[in-house]
Amino acid sequence: MQNIGYGHMTRSSENLDQLESKISQLQSDFSKSSNTRLSLPFSKNTQKLNCAQEVLNHFHLGDLLHKMAYIKGESRHIFFDYLIFKTFAHPSIYDTILDHVVALSQFCIQTHGRYNIHINIKSFTVTAAQRYNDLILKFFSICLQKDSIMVKNLDNIYIYNSPKMFESITRIFSNFIDDEIQSKIIHVKETF
């Protein structure tokens, strides 16, 4: 496992604010250099994973993780941004991503006794659900097991920017989501 620096759980670094534009520039350069305009779905998926690997090669994983998922201030609210996640999510680091989310949850539980998760899923698609299927299923099995500490201390999961086809995406994973968890999911129209 890579050292990702859990000492500071909240996002406050000015460098993190610049990270998004640097990632965007790298993705643009990658797209131009690798001629990623192919239309085959499997090719596009491979190219997205290759681009994610390129982002991982150029940026510190800890910075990427802290930009993707963080605790806002001194609160018990964990924010997860899919728009950042998708820029670097690669099967080689799925365990590290899960470790980061678990560490944030445990920090909130130890500090506040409870926690909430806020997830921005803007631009999440059915193909993204398929691409990250292994990670999503692992998240459900590790983090959202019935009667686990993480479930017992979870107040709500707020979902922001749900795509129109979100119900279709939810059906894909509905067998893995416990009824107790489903009752804690709240869809919010505005973004965080």
Model-based region annotation:
Residues 1-156, 160, 164-192:
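SEC14/CRAL-TRIO lipid-binding/transfer domains and related phosphoinositide-recognition modules
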